[in-house]
């Protein structure tokens, strides 16, 4: 062999191989699914390239996958006549993992094998799964359109290095030979291999054939028997497809080992003709928050594969959706650029978006437990929707789930429809609070009056919530109201103050004036409030003022944050406020007011600029 060289695996490959062999062994037969799936992808890519260059078929347009084994040599071979690989492509695809974030992903894996197998499964192990059952793997490949002498040989024992060399290979495509480990003889059994192919590959449009050897007139005659149906699953009638087939097809296109939560298969005819098969995964992909990674549907045009990860058909907040679209209205030579500006694309995107939202609404109604699984995995992504998709805002809002004072649990299970159905007579607004954590939201002094009145408050503690609520202004005709902002409806909820209380409040006017003079420009205003029952003071913001949580979002993003001007509200019935009002010594009065303000700021922001000063001030007042 010419041009032979030995190279070391990228470190992530070594780590993945080790984890995979140990974590996936209990489900080892999936290696055959993965290798056949890769062969199917190679055929799809050849079909696509041949649209503009039919010579790539080299006179052989009947694409297929073939599986054969040699019991004497203990080898299993999977071959295809797809697009094949050049030497550079072999090194890129078989020696490295070209995915950003791989290293941190692998470092996150621990010793929990069940969990590891799920995570590795969604990572998409593909070719490397061969090493689960093989102690050596040999690859012979030639790219379509290359000369026979430009074939490539690759071999590795899956430990630390691999060998690559130039060979002559007459037929294009890729041939992968697995040298099976001791104890893996089941994969040399014709019936066993056939059953695995039927189980995992019935839905693939490409014929999968197994070698048949027969003795005729003293000679061995080799023929090939087709094992799978070889009809693209989405082209079949829905009534003929079993749930098991839908699940296996999902695993094929998503490279996921887990079953999907739900799916929707639709054929649309009329002004636009297309078929869609959309899946909601049961687990978030490891790279869902990686902005560099493309997320999208597989695109077919008239059953011809065009591209993976076509992002144009699904809004970003639905980037977790997996599946495909097969359109009859797009040209076969369509490119990502053409898709970007196409009216057909926009119409398909709108239709598919509505389809997914309807699918999620149905899941929420039919199976609350499954929907809760969805929400735990993808709720944060769906919360991007109200800002991104105004046209579907009401439909998205119905799908949102929140923690609430009604359930007294951190689990986000309350829908806006649930909340509205429980609103008190005369209640006009949907009340909510945003905070850094569920505990901080639940114990906020802003809730005291509402708890006393039995009015439900949504407790929002995800980082995205404050941003989302800037766009989500109402639901079912009811406006949202943050309880940390000054609002007339909140003041109305306070009990009517009797005449004697009003007189007592008038008597506190000089006290309020003293506080204003002391704090000056540090606060926007100082006033008395009847919204508190147990707390001496709170800070709140005007409706047009930036909220505390929004200021934190800006700061976390490294942006300049304008100073939040708070309104300092004091509870006239609280013993500490009364004590401060009765204090004539200006130095001690200042200590009391500063302590009450710091307490209110600490409850609102979770931090103080000078916590040591706060502690000293509190200690001085405790001993005085």
Swiss-Prot record:
Main subcellular location of this protein, as a coarse class: cytoplasm
PROSITE patterns, sorted: HSP90
Disulfide-bond pairs as recorded: none
Region span, B: 337-552
Subcellular location: Cytoplasm
Pfam families in UniProt: HATPase_c_3, HSP90
Region (A): 1-336
GO cellular component term of the entry, any: cytoplasm
Keywords: ATP-binding, Chaperone, Cytoplasm, Nucleotide-binding, Stress response
Residue span of region C: 553-624
Molecular function GO labels: ATP binding; ATP hydrolysis activity; ATP-dependent protein folding chaperone; unfolded protein binding
SMART domains linked to this entry: HATPase_c
SUPFAM superfamilies reported for this sequence: ATPase domain of HSP90 chaperone/DNA topoisomerase II/histidine kinase, HSP90 C-terminal domain, Ribosomal protein S5 domain 2-like
Record's function text: Molecular chaperone. Has ATPase activity.
Summary of subunit composition and partner proteins: Homodimer.
Family as reported in the entry's similarity comment: Belongs to the heat shock protein 90 family.
Record protein name field: Chaperone protein HtpG
Source organism per UniProt: Shigella flexneri
